[in-house]
Amino acid sequence: MAYKITSLAGDGIGPEIMASGIKILEAIAAKYNHTFEIESHPFGGAGIDAAGDPIPPETLKACQNADAILLGAIGGPKWDNAPKRPEDGLLALRKALGLFANIRPIQVPSSITHLSPLKKEIVENTDFVVVRELTGGLYFGEPKHWDDVAAVDSLTYTRVEIERIIEKAFEIASTRNKKVTSVDKANVLASSKLWRKIAEEVASRHPDITLEHLYVDAAAMLMIQRPTTFDVIVTENLFGDILSDEASVITGSLGMLPSASHAENGPSLYEPIHGSAPDIANQNIANPMSMISSVSMMLRQSFSLFKEADAIDAATARTMQAGFLTADLGGNTSTTDFTNEVLKQIEGGE
């Protein structure tokens, strides 16, 4: 079977880490006899440079026709004053594809627990997932207005928006440790009262999965105090934006973590959580781990290639345990050397 993948390398370190991700895909294809049809297109700043638009029509069409999309990174000071910014392309892509659920796994490999800003005994064995709603809430609510006297933002959520994201969280929890933590502010916000009510309704359809509720301030505190108590966290757009970024620093480096964004139907988008890091671009020092892990997520969640994804995850773990660490992890391994070691581990693994 052939899998169609649209590659959006983007800007800054994006092309370097995308090259790593594609090499990993090629190794998996060779070892397990798969065909990955990879089509590259300009996006973000590269799209502006190539076609005057962060998401040129050809790029959007390729994304819509793909089985999955890989994104490197976008943005940079070069386009700060452009009429359309690179980030506008990502918002447009999310809207065009109907991407409503952002999935961010948080894990701390034993080889880098010493890099976490938290104590080793706190972060050891951390393994949870943040599920963030992407299409509703304060970021998209109307009316929205500001002037010198006052400003208005509107927080709106519909039953459909809430129910589908909470169902997604329960779906993920069913494959993990069967616990969902729903995060809201139901003691203050009307939208959170509806959120909590619907969470209970969804939970009643999944009796084998435990549901707990936390106010967002308590969740933010517990994520630092006892991160190992979480399995799947689900929350609305603004809270998810903040909590997922808070969770990301537990590992000690943004270069470690992947993310996925899913629609109800159609292709999903996989990308590292970090930015384009233009200050280290083209120096062969970027950590490709988050891109490689994004490839693993894609194989697992879009293509159901679980054995192949496990092979990638095991290879990256062995690579780091052997001391191959990039600069952000306190080492001096280059982007290409790290990638080559992972390739070696994939080829030599079971």
Swiss-Prot record:
Cofactor binding annotation: Binds 1 Mg(2+) or Mn(2+) ion per subunit.
Lineage: superkingdom: Bacteria
Keyword entries, A-Z: Amino-acid biosynthesis, Branched-chain amino acid biosynthesis, Cytoplasm, Leucine biosynthesis, Magnesium, Manganese, Metal-binding, NAD, Oxidoreductase
Positions bound to substrate: 94, 104, 132, 217
Gene Ontology cellular-component terms listed: cytosol
Molecular-function GO term, any one: magnesium ion binding
Cross-referenced Pfam families: Iso_dh
Stored Gene3D superfamilies: Isopropylmalate Dehydrogenase
Recorded metabolic or biological pathway in which this protein acts: Amino-acid biosynthesis; L-leucine biosynthesis; L-leucine from 3-methyl-2-oxobutanoate: step 3/4
An individual GO BP term: L-leucine biosynthetic process
Binding locations of NAD(+): 76-87, 275-287
Enzyme Commission code(s) on record: 1.1.1.85
Catalytic activity: (2R,3S)-3-isopropylmalate + NAD(+) = 4-methyl-2-oxopentanoate + CO2 + NADH
Function description: Catalyzes the oxidation of 3-carboxy-2-hydroxy-4-methylpentanoate (3-isopropylmalate) to 3-carboxy-4-methyl-2-oxopentanoate. The product decarboxylates to 4-methyl-2 oxopentanoate.
HAMAP family: LeuB_type1
Family, as annotated: Belongs to the isocitrate and isopropylmalate dehydrogenases family. LeuB type 1 subfamily.
Protein name as annotated: 3-isopropylmalate dehydrogenase
Gene: leuB
